[in-house]
């Protein structure tokens, strides 16, 4: 009966802006388990995939390599660069990359009343598969704790925090779209991500 009550309360928290059942799936590890099953690889050259998450926005502003995506956002400057390659290590040119992240207070632009997009952008890799952009250092942030999932975390002694990260979606002709995240290596929540 307690389990039925918990699931009922979880369902009652769901609406067009909040999906408590998805949050429950995330915190129980089911979401990532399904993603891992659907994107199995033993190749160390292949980046680990993840789910899209609730803060992706299609068609972000396009920027050139090396430009800033931190329009009107305060925070510690952070330079991101990398190289996209295939499983043989060959560089991939013209890969379309969407990036998005939280600000230094742990909020995404869609959670604030901003007039335009911020801390999200689209760009393409160069002939050597390279990309680069300036942003601000993202911050860890808590998932919602005002519902049944928050109570579950509390009674099981788990914190509600996600480690600081930047989301990436990479799209290239002839390849499966990759959604992944890059985490700050020294984040205190890196080994205990709430989701």
Segments predicted by a language model, with ranges:
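Beta-strand-dominated extracellular/periplasmic modules and repeats
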Residues: 1-195
């Amino acid at each position: 009966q307690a389990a039925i009550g918990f699931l009922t309360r979880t369902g009652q928290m769901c609406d067009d802006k909040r999906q408590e059942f998805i949050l429950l799936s995330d915190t129980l590890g089911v979401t990532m388990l399904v993603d891992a099953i659907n994107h199995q690889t033993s190749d160390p050259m292949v980046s680990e995939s993840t789910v899209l998450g609730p803060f992706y926005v299609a068609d972000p502003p396009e920027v050139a390599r090396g430009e800033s995506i931190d329009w009107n956002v305060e925070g510690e400057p952070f330079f991101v660069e990398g190289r996209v390659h295939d499983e043989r290590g060959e560089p991939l040119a013209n890969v379309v990359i969407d990036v998005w992240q939280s600000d230094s207070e742990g909020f995404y632009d869609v959670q604030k009343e901003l007039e335009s997009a911020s801390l999200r952008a689209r760009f393409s890799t160069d002939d050597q598969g390279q990309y680069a952009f300036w942003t601000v250092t993202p911050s860890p942030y808590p998932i919602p704790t005002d519902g049944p999932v928050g109570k579950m975390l509390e009674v099981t002694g788990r914190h509600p925090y996600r480690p600081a990260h930047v989301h990436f979606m990479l799209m290239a002709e002839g390849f499966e779209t990759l959604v992944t995240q890059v985490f700050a290596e020294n984040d205190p929540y890196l080994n205990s991500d709430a989701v």
